[in-house]
Amino acid sequence: MTNLRKTHPLMKIVNSSFIDLPTPSNISSWWNFGSLLGICLIVQILTGLFLAMHYTSDTLTAFSSVTHICRDVNYGWLIRYMHANGASMFFICLFMHVGRGIYYGSYMFLETWNIGVLLLFAVMATAFMGYVLPWGQMSFWGATVITNLLSAIPYIGTDLVEWIWGGFSVDKATLTRFFAFHFILPFIVAALAGVHLLFLHETGSNNPSGLSSDADKIPFHPYYTIKDILGVLLFILVLTSLVLFSPDLLGDPDNYTPANPLNTPPHIKPEWYFLFAYAILRSIPNKLGGVLALVLSILVLAVIPFLHTSKQRSMMFRPLSQCLFWILVADLLTLTWIGGQPVEHPFIIIGQLASILYFLLILVLMPITSLFENNLLKW
């Protein structure tokens, strides 16, 4: 009799994805982040579900309902901080996952990569709307500033912003619809992640060398299930340490003040994982230009496959490209730092230079360096 997991219509999908999946024998721990992102999503959906049971999406009671969750609900504080810090962990894993894709040339799987970029946009939208829900000062002003950016769109901008707000300012209608979208989007993300996996399994995984691994495959289980468990344990260690020892480390103190439309906080800034894009937005004096740069800072990822000029897929054997890659990482860290600083000298000029360098590296320097490396190989 054939094994049930290989014949049952549902079980064989799981089997071909997580058990008998032929996997390259040499993939490193950088390939752990896919499974970690799946776990992040599950944790966020579950904690979010329990938070939604106690949360009220009304401007008068939203802030109080979050306080009630933390004080009166059994382990409500734990659920709330797991959800808030889980988002930070989600983005850490996302950035590592995308960075791995750029370094090892995984973007050559076009469909998988493009759905990944779409997933990044969807997760960013979800996180932004989630940040508005506690209805603290930074929630309110963050929502006001970011939604207001759409008014830079010519002709339809102002109408579009008022349509999104459901009125003439961020108010009850805005909060209610943001809650509705924040609830539905993670399920759309889950569906997209399924499609992401579907396309990945059409081609099989990439590996650090960037060479074909068809001649050397091993089953996913037990080798990579065990390897992934190590990543999961480290992930749980970091998340629980954050939640139990310093839950507000990555948050903003202003969000413990209830939203007040009459009092603007001195420094409006988003959560840390949006600061790099926020710095790029602020570095351009023109409003429309800033909005375009903000969108392009993520959309530029979709262009990377078309700028691949190297004869080799991975950066493993390309020291010059490696050097540029780590400069890009340092540049993104600089942008993240600048995004959290006030708009004054010398931060303005540092932000502008870092923004120029970001686009210059991806669009110009990396493709040119790849061409140069191709010629280095001609003895």
UniProtKB/Swiss-Prot annotation:
Q: Which GO terms describe its cellular component?
A: mitochondrial inner membrane; respiratory chain complex III
Provide an example Pfam family for this protein: Cytochrom_B_C
Residues holding a ubiquinone: 201
Does the record bear ATP-binding in its keywords?
A: no
Instruction: Please indicate which superkingdom the organism of origin belongs to.
Output: Eukaryota
User: One MF term from GO for this chain?
Assistant: ubiquinol-cytochrome-c reductase activity
TM region positions? 33-53, 77-98, 113-133, 178-198, 226-246, 288-308, 320-340, 347-367
Predominant subcellular localization, coarse grouping: mitochondrion
InterPro entries referenced in this protein's UniProt entry, alphabetically: Cyt_b/b6_C, Cyt_b/b6_C_sf, Cyt_b/b6_N, Cytb/b6-like_sf, Cytochrome_b, Cytochrome_b_C_euk/bac, Cytochrome_b_N_euk/bac, Di-haem_cyt_TM
Q: How does it assemble?
A: The cytochrome bc1 complex contains 11 subunits: 3 respiratory subunits (MT-CYB, CYC1 and UQCRFS1), 2 core proteins (UQCRC1 and UQCRC2) and 6 low-molecular weight proteins (UQCRH/QCR6, UQCRB/QCR7, UQCRQ/QCR8, UQCR10/QCR9, UQCR11/QCR10 and a cleavage product of UQCRFS1). This cytochrome bc1 complex then forms a dimer.
Q: What else is known?
A: Heme 1 (or BL or b562) is low-potential and absorbs at about 562 nm, and heme 2 (or BH or b566) is high-potential and absorbs at about 566 nm.
Q: What is this protein called?
A: Cytochrome b
